C-alpha cells in the first residue's frame, strides 16, 4: 500500500484518508429523517466560505487524503459549487472527488460537475411512488429527481449510486422495485439503516427501524446476492447480483453491523467543526483556526493532526433509545 510519511493516523492505528465536507446546511427538501420541517438555517457569516472549504480540502490532501465527498444539506444549492469542485478535483494526489445529492439540481448541473472533475455521484432516492416521495421529502418532486439521475448518466458519470434510507412501514415494501430501477439504469444502490441524529416527529425511530439483514433477506427472495469484497472507501458492504452484472447492492448498517473498526474518515461541518465520529460530539473548531490564522497552513495542519486523539474507537447508536446526537443530519453532512 502507498504510504505517506505525513499520513493521518488515529490513536487506534487507523489511517484517515477520507474526508466528508458539508458545504451547506440548506436544502430544497425537508426529508423526515434528516431535518425538521421548520428548520432554521445558519447565517452566512457562520458558515465556511468557499475559499475556507478549499483550504481545508487542500490541507487534508497534503496529509494523505485520497477521497473527498461533498455533502450538505444539498450541496448543489450552494452558489459557486461547480468552481469549488473544479479547484478540489485538481489537487495533486486526490483520487476521488464525490458528491452526494438529492438529485433535484442535477438536470442543470450534472454536465458542469462532470466537466469540473467530480468522479462519482450518490443520489438519494427513498421511493418510486410520487406521493410517498413527497411525504418523505416534504417538498421533493420525484419526476425532477429521476430526470436528474438520467442527466447524470448522460453527462458521463459511472458507478452512480442510489442511496435509500429504509423506514419500516413507509418505504420498505419498495425494496425490490428500487433494485429493479437501479438495474434498468445500470446504477448501484445502497440501503441505509436510519441513524439517530436530531429530534424528529414524523415517526418513532424504534418502530421504523429496518435492519440491513432484513432488507437483504427480502431481496434474496427475488435476486441472487453474491457477497463482494469490493469497497468504495466508505462504510458500505456490497453484494453483486447474479442477474445484473452492472449493479451492486450495498448496505450501510450503523446499528446491526457497525463499521467502526475500519473507520477511515472524518467529517467537516458547514460551520467548520471537524467531527471525528458521526456518533459522538467530539469535534475541533477549524473555522476558528482559519480565521484567527489566515493564510497559515501550518496552524491548520497542526489543528487537524491534534484532533485525531479525540477520535473514539466506536459510536454507541442504539435502536429505539434516546437521541444521542441532537444535531440534525443536514448539519453534520449527509
UniProtKB/Swiss-Prot annotation:
<comment type="function">
    <text>Catalyzes the cyclization of GTP to (8S)-3',8-cyclo-7,8-dihydroguanosine 5'-triphosphate.</text>
</comment>
<feature type="binding site">
    <location>
        <position position="124"/>
    </location>
    <ligand>
        <name>S-adenosyl-L-methionine</name>
    </ligand>
</feature>
<feature type="binding site">
    <location>
        <begin position="265"/>
        <end position="267"/>
    </location>
    <ligand>
        <name>GTP</name>
    </ligand>
</feature>
<keyword id="KW-0004">4Fe-4S</keyword>
<dbReference type="GO" id="GO:1904047">
    <property type="term" value="F:S-adenosyl-L-methionine binding"/>
</dbReference>
<feature type="binding site">
    <location>
        <position position="69"/>
    </location>
    <ligand>
        <name>GTP</name>
    </ligand>
</feature>
<feature type="binding site">
    <location>
        <position position="34"/>
    </location>
    <ligand>
        <name>[4Fe-4S] cluster 1</name>
    </ligand>
</feature>
<keyword id="KW-0501">Molybdenum cofactor biosynthesis</keyword>
<dbReference type="InterPro" id="IPR050105">
    <property type="entry name" value="MoCo_biosynth_MoaA/MoaC"/>
</dbReference>
<protein>
    <recommendedName>
        <fullName>GTP 3',8-cyclase</fullName>
        <ecNumber>4.1.99.22</ecNumber>
    </recommendedName>
</protein>
<feature type="domain" description="Radical SAM core">
    <location>
        <begin position="11"/>
        <end position="236"/>
    </location>
</feature>
<feature type="binding site">
    <location>
        <position position="31"/>
    </location>
    <ligand>
        <name>[4Fe-4S] cluster 1</name>
    </ligand>
</feature>
<feature type="binding site">
    <location>
        <position position="195"/>
    </location>
    <ligand>
        <name>S-adenosyl-L-methionine</name>
    </ligand>
</feature>
<dbReference type="GO" id="GO:0046872">
    <property type="term" value="F:metal ion binding"/>
</dbReference>
<keyword id="KW-0547">Nucleotide-binding</keyword>
<keyword id="KW-0456">Lyase</keyword>
<dbReference type="GO" id="GO:0006777">
    <property type="term" value="P:Mo-molybdopterin cofactor biosynthetic process"/>
</dbReference>
<dbReference type="InterPro" id="IPR006638">
    <property type="entry name" value="Elp3/MiaA/NifB-like_rSAM"/>
</dbReference>
<keyword id="KW-0949">S-adenosyl-L-methionine</keyword>
<feature type="binding site">
    <location>
        <position position="263"/>
    </location>
    <ligand>
        <name>[4Fe-4S] cluster 2</name>
    </ligand>
</feature>
<feature type="binding site">
    <location>
        <position position="73"/>
    </location>
    <ligand>
        <name>S-adenosyl-L-methionine</name>
    </ligand>
</feature>
<dbReference type="InterPro" id="IPR000385">
    <property type="entry name" value="MoaA_NifB_PqqE_Fe-S-bd_CS"/>
</dbReference>
<dbReference type="InterPro" id="IPR010505">
    <property type="entry name" value="MoaA_twitch"/>
</dbReference>
<dbReference type="Pfam" id="PF04055">
    <property type="entry name" value="Radical_SAM"/>
</dbReference>
<keyword id="KW-0342">GTP-binding</keyword>
<comment type="pathway">
    <text>Cofactor biosynthesis; molybdopterin biosynthesis.</text>
</comment>
<comment type="subunit">
    <text>Monomer and homodimer.</text>
</comment>
<keyword id="KW-0408">Iron</keyword>
<feature type="binding site">
    <location>
        <position position="27"/>
    </location>
    <ligand>
        <name>[4Fe-4S] cluster 1</name>
    </ligand>
</feature>
<dbReference type="GO" id="GO:0051539">
    <property type="term" value="F:4 iron, 4 sulfur cluster binding"/>
</dbReference>
<dbReference type="Pfam" id="PF13353">
    <property type="entry name" value="Fer4_12"/>
</dbReference>
<feature type="binding site">
    <location>
        <position position="100"/>
    </location>
    <ligand>
        <name>GTP</name>
    </ligand>
</feature>
<feature type="binding site">
    <location>
        <position position="260"/>
    </location>
    <ligand>
        <name>[4Fe-4S] cluster 2</name>
    </ligand>
</feature>
<feature type="binding site">
    <location>
        <position position="20"/>
    </location>
    <ligand>
        <name>GTP</name>
    </ligand>
</feature>
<keyword id="KW-0479">Metal-binding</keyword>
<keyword id="KW-0411">Iron-sulfur</keyword>
<comment type="similarity">
    <text>Belongs to the radical SAM superfamily. MoaA family.</text>
</comment>
<dbReference type="GO" id="GO:0061798">
    <property type="term" value="F:GTP 3',8'-cyclase activity"/>
</dbReference>
<dbReference type="InterPro" id="IPR007197">
    <property type="entry name" value="rSAM"/>
</dbReference>
<feature type="binding site">
    <location>
        <position position="161"/>
    </location>
    <ligand>
        <name>GTP</name>
    </ligand>
</feature>
<feature type="binding site">
    <location>
        <position position="277"/>
    </location>
    <ligand>
        <name>[4Fe-4S] cluster 2</name>
    </ligand>
</feature>
<dbReference type="Pfam" id="PF06463">
    <property type="entry name" value="Mob_synth_C"/>
</dbReference>
